């Protein structure tokens, strides 16, 4: 292991330890979904839906990124951890759209199918 690889590995360990202790959150239990603003604008819902649409490509971003740094443990595991955290953002916004009544689960599945049909 080169000095750079070792340093990246140590940085990853520190990052992961801090993330576990301070930044972990649950889409399902840390957001008060019962207080969601059902009167939010359609423009806000469209912004959330657009973000969800972009995030549906997360597996592609991750696969490409991990393949680039696969030989470097710290970098590869940082990439995997980043993907996990990033996926929660899309989950939260999808949950928001459904809980707010702005979109149904069926509409969100349809959106996913339309996007994946273009790949």
What are these regions (language model features)?
Residues 1-119:
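Non-heme di-metal
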